[in-house]
Design a protein with these regions (language model features):
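Conserved glycosyltransferase catalytic-site signature
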Residues: 7, 41, 98-100, 118
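Acidic, PIN/NYN-like endoribonuclease modules and their adjacent C-terminal/linker elements
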Residues: 29, 103-137
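Anion (oxyanion) recognition and catalysis
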Residues: 32, 62, 107
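A general structural signal for well-ordered alpha-helical segments in protein cores
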Residues: 40, 44, 54-57, 76, ...
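Active-site-proximal, substrate-binding regions of enzyme catalytic domains
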Residues: 52-74
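Active-site neighborhoods of divalent-metal-dependent phosphate/nucleic-acid chemistry enzymes
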Residues: 67-112, 116
Length: 137
């Protein structure tokens, strides 16, 4: 079982959010027991902002047993189609392309996505299996 991890889950741990920290840690531990964990390039870039160096970010991911997996051309294309459909349906530009890349990456290169942003992903990636740690309460 491959679990893709969204940035918001990792930020719950890096910038401890008392509301979500325990649930996100438990969900990551559960994902690790179920198989492997990955992040796409976009999540990696968003995560690196919170570290002084690339080495520190890489160590954090290595310690968490999360590997970075590049977005495939197929996933990039799927993200572009989802973005286009979203805009045609009147979707506002409040959603950035990175969100679509994260969803397409998880749909095509993992078995599921661990994220607190389930409404967005459920609507635009209906076949994507989603795990929401806040549902653990």
């Amino acid at each position: 079982m491959i679990t893709a991890i969204d940035t918001n889950i990792l930020l719950d741990i890096l910038a401890p959010d008392p509301e979500f920290l325990d649930d996100s840690v438990a969900a990551l531990e559960e994902a690790a027991r179920a198989g492997s964990m990955i992040v796409c390039d976009q999540v990696y870039a968003e995560l690196c902002v919170h570290f002084a160096s690339r080495r520190e970010c890489d160590e954090f991911l290595r310690d968490a047993e999360i590997r970075v997996e590049a977005l495939s051309a197929e996933a990039s294309f799927a993200a572009s189609r989802a973005w286009r459909a979203y805009r045609k349906q009147g979707g506002q530009r409040t959603r950035i392309l990175a969100d679509f890349l994260i969803g397409a990456h998880a749909q095509l290169q993992a078995d599921r996505l661990l994220s607190r942003d389930r409404g967005f992903y459920r609507k635009l990636f209906p076949s994507l299996k989603l795990l929401d740690p806040s549902g653990r309460r």
